């Protein structure tokens, strides 16, 4: 070993020992005839002092981030010089020898000062020398170990599934890989291990897990990565309660790493309730401000804007005092979200209603409105009217915006909730508008994925009442972030084919794309279900950072670019020729 001790491990009890340390020069201070450096390694920092004339001469050439090895005697710092801010603050190492292991060029940014994200990612190997980014990566390793410990205790088997496979429609675009030995044909990087983990259940593995790399060629959205990680699990002979129970045990083990005890059982809310009360299928329950249904209240209104299939409201406490320019700003805020605006009524301190909407209301509506929505004098009532889904989504976004503006969210709080019983299908146009890829060519597509089982009792309504079929599915939400989602799966070929048909996949197309799965279901497939946790998002929450990029060792930018390696990059003509990327496949011959 090039060193005898870790820099952060030395204490006053080590005084008198000769040690050899190795690490980086975090800071250098020249005090005339004495030079001090803060020597940093993965364990922490120790102050090294150079007094010996021969070693002092060498130390003059040290600069920030030189990699060095130092041998010397551990000494108690002189009285008054202790540093209580660091664990090694009572001691210093009096150097008797110095070896420069690697010099450093001038730094592109100072490691103890803020730097722009693109510069940080371009020099990520320097960024990770900082304490906060390094701590996030190290915590992630502990998170992996904690999850594995729980799963191993419950007899799960860790199995690796393929990372180059067949392109199958799963709700997003595939990254495609040309197959050089099969010109004109392509592999795909998996969007998830979904099909393989179901096949592992057919294979009798019974309990599978994997910390899986997944790939989705999505339009770039804020805080998304083209490659991401999920903790993937699947179990045979279970119902939703079994999957939820093991999931809660895993989450409790993870949050215990940061000293938080998750109250269990985690509360549940139906998808329908979440949308009606919070305007979101991933509600943040750290604050109240529930939406209020007003459709019945305004059923006889003469105000044309409120003559809509849905009218709802959310109250902003104290919002009546907002100046006109702020209220106008809310209209721009709503328009940026695709709405025409955000109607509002101001409740005066005397209880009188003001604002442009109030004068369009009947006397009875004005008299009863504040009581109906729970508004007090001085509050502002925001409204949305129109189709229920987009109107509730707008109010849900307004609810979150109000909470942020009023400081209603305790940043130290944790609020977990299961969202259960979502619809199995949604209109394909809605999925496309949200940036997803509809699996088939039908009017309906799957809300989660095409392999989710309908809730018991809904099987007969798949074709006849498609929009009202509920899924046997469950999402786990933390502080308004969906951190995991799962379901009981279809394990019968006939039901799977019916679901495909509703989504516009005819028998031939289903056979072409999913024939291997359908065939597997004919060999005694067990009932099974599972869940996948968004590992990057969970780690970001545990490290209390805003972006998942902070918990990924070498992330891409929001635009999918890696500033470090300058990927993606063009390929050469030779690579293009060898890959067969331009070869058109021969038409399939009829059997």
UniProtKB/Swiss-Prot annotation:
This chain's function reads: Aspartyl-tRNA synthetase with relaxed tRNA specificity since it is able to aspartylate not only its cognate tRNA(Asp) but also tRNA(Asn). Reaction proceeds in two steps: L-aspartate is first activated by ATP to form Asp-AMP and then transferred to the acceptor end of tRNA(Asp/Asn).
Location in the cell reads:
Cytoplasm
- Annotated stretches, region: Aspartate: 194-197
Q: Which residues bind ATP?
A: 216-218, 225, 482, 534-537
Residues given in the record as L-aspartate binding sites: 170, 216, 448, 489
What SUPFAM superfamilies does the database record attribute to this sequence?
A: Class II aaRS and biotin synthetases (SSF55681), GAD domain-like (SSF55261), Nucleic acid-binding proteins (SSF50249)
Write down the superkingdom of origin. Bacteria
Keyword DNA-binding set for record = no
The record's HAMAP family line, in alphabetical order, gives: Asp_tRNA_synth_type1
Q: Where is this region: Disordered?
A: 559-591
Q: Which Pfam families match?
A: GAD (PF02938), tRNA-synt_2 (PF00152), tRNA_anti-codon (PF01336)
MF (Gene Ontology):
aspartate-tRNA ligase activity; aspartate-tRNA(Asn) ligase activity; ATP binding; nucleic acid binding
InterPro entries associated with the record: Aa-tRNA-synt_II, aa-tRNA-synth_II, aa-tRNA-synth_II/BPL/LPL, Asp-tRNA-ligase_1, Asp-tRNA-ligase_1_N, Asp/Asn-tRNA-synth_IIb, AspRS_core, GAD-like_sf
Catalysed conversion reaction: tRNA(Asx) + L-aspartate + ATP = L-aspartyl-tRNA(Asx) + AMP + diphosphate
What is this enzyme's EC? 6.1.1.23
Oligomeric and partner information: Homodimer.
| Protein name as catalogued | Aspartate--tRNA(Asp/Asn) ligase
Q: Quick one: where is this thing mainly located?
A: cytoplasm
């Amino acid at each position: 070993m090039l060193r005898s001790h870790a820099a952060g491990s030395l204490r006053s009890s080590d005084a008198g020992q000769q040690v050899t340390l190795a690490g980086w020069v975090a800071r250098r201070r020249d005090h005339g005839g004495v030079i001090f450096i803060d020597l940093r390694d993965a364990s922490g920092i120790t102050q090294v002092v150079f007094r010996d004339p021969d070693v002092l001469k060498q130390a003059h050439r040290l600069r920030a981030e030189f990699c060095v090895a130092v041998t010397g005697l551990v000494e108690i710092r002189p009285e008054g010089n202790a540093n209580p801010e660091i664990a090694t603050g009572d001691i210093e190492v009096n150097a008797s020898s110095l070896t420069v292991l690697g010099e450093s060029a001038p730094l592109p940014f100072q490691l103890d000062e803020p730097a722009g994200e693109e510069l940080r990612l371009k020099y990520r190997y320097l960024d990770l020398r900082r304490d906060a980014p390094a701590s996030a990566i190290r915590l992630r390793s502990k998170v992996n170990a904690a999850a594995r410990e729980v799963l191993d205790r419950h007899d799960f088997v860790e199995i690796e599934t393929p990372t180059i496979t067949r392109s199958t429609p799963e709700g997003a675009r595939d990254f495609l890989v040309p197959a050089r030995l099969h010109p004109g044909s392509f592999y795909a990087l998996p969007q998830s291990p979904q099909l393989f983990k179901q096949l592992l259940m057919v294979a009798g593995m019974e309990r599978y897990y994997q910390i899986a790399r997944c790939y989705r060629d999505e339009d770039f959205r804020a805080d998304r990565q083209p490659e991401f990680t999920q903790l993937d699990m699947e179990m045979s002979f279970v119902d939703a309660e079994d999957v939820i129970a093991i999931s809660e045990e895993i989450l409790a083990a993870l949050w215990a790493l940061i000293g938080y005890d998750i109250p269990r059982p985690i509360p549940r809310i139906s998808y329908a309730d979440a949308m009606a009360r919070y305007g979101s299928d991933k509600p943040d329950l750290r604050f109240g401000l529930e939406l209020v249904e007003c459709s019945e209240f305004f059923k006889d209104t003469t105000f044309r804007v409120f003559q809509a299939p849905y009218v709802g409201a959310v109250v902003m406490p104290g919002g009546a005092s907002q100046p006109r320019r702020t209220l106008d700003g809310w209209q721009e805020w709503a328009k940026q979200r695709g709405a025409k605006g955000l109607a509002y009524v101001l409740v005066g301190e005397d209880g009188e209603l003001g604002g442009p909407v109030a004068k369009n209301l009947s006397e009875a509506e004005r008299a009863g409105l504040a009581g109906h929505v729970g508004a007090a004098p001085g509050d502002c009532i925001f409204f949305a009217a129109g189709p229920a889904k987009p109107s509730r989504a707008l109010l849900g976004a307004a609810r979150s915006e109000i909470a942020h503006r009023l400081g209603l969210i305790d940043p130290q709080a944790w609020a977990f909730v299961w969202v259960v019983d979502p619809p199995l299908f949604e209109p394909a146009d809605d999925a496309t508008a949200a940036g997803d890829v509809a699996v088939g060519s039908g009017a309906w597509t799957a809300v989660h994925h095409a392999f989710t089982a309908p809730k018991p009792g809904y099987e007969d309504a798949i074709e006849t009442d498609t929009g009202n079929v509920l899924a046997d599915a469950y999402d786990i939400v933390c502080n308004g972030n969906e951190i995991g989602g799962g379901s009981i799966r279809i394990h019968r070929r006939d039901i799977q084919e019916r679901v495909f048909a509703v989504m516009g996949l005819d028998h031939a197309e289903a056979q072409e794309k999913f024939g291997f799965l359908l065939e597997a279901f004919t060999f005694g497939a067990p009932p099974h279900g599972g869940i996948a946790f968004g590992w990057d998002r969970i780690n970001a929450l545990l490290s209390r950072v805003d972006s998942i990029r902070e918990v990924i060792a070498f992330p891409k930018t929001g635009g999918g670019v890696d500033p470090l390696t300058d990927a993606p990059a063009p390929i050469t003509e030779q690579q293009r020729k060898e890959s067969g990327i331009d070869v058109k496949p021969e038409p399939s011959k009829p059997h």
